[in-house]
Amino acid sequence: MKSLYVAFGGALGAVSRYVISKFINSSFSFSFVPWGTIFVNVVGSFLLSFLMFLSISKTDISQSFILFFGTGFLGAFTTFSTFAYEFLSIFLTQPLRAIIYFIANIFLGFFAAILGMFLGRGRIL
């Protein structure tokens, strides 16, 4: 049963990532970087960190929900492989732009995860 929670969450997360990323990238086709990938990675980093730190302080969050939403949905919603591919594709022709994309993705993702940790714990420090 646990595998089904992950599978269903993963299916929804993958489709959500595809739709959101395509919408954002087509809305900002003139953009300097692929904002769709940055968006899903940053939002996913925040939500997963928030969920996991909240689950530490609140024992009433079910393991089934964590498997469905954390492991399944957010695991498929975020995408390291697309980030790596896009970075390398950009790097081949525009190395400086690729490095900016890399730094933005990592920095914003970790910032979002730290914010999620603080909010999930319910306190700043």
Curated annotation (Swiss-Prot):
**Residues of the signal peptide:** none
Annotated transmembrane regions: 36-56, 65-85, 99-119
Q: Which InterPro entries match?
A: FluC
> What subcellular compartments does it reside in?
Cell inner membrane
Q: Name one GO biological process term.
A: cellular detoxification of fluoride
Give UniProt keywords alphabetically. Answer: Cell inner membrane, Cell membrane, Ion channel, Ion transport, Membrane, Metal-binding, Sodium, Transmembrane, Transmembrane helix, Transport
One GO cellular component term noted in the UniProt record for this chain: plasma membrane
GO MF terms held by the record: fluoride channel activity; metal ion binding
Keyword match Transmembrane helix: yes
Q: Name one Pfam family in it.
A: CRCB
How is it regulated at the activity level? Na(+) is not transported, but it plays an essential structural role and its presence is essential for fluoride channel function.
Per the record, what are the reactions this protein catalyses? fluoride(in) = fluoride(out)
Provide the residue positions that the database annotates as binding Na(+).
G75, T78
Topology in the membrane? Answer: Multi-pass membrane protein
Q: What does this protein do?
A: Fluoride-specific ion channel. Important for reducing fluoride concentration in the cell, thus reducing its toxicity.
Its family remark reads: Belongs to the fluoride channel Fluc/FEX (TC 1.A.43) family.
Q: Which NCBIfam families match?
A: crcB (TIGR00494)
| Name by which UniProt lists this protein | Fluoride-specific ion channel FluC
Q: Which organism is it from?
A: Thermosipho africanus (strain TCF52B)
Name of the gene encoding the protein in the UniProt record: fluC
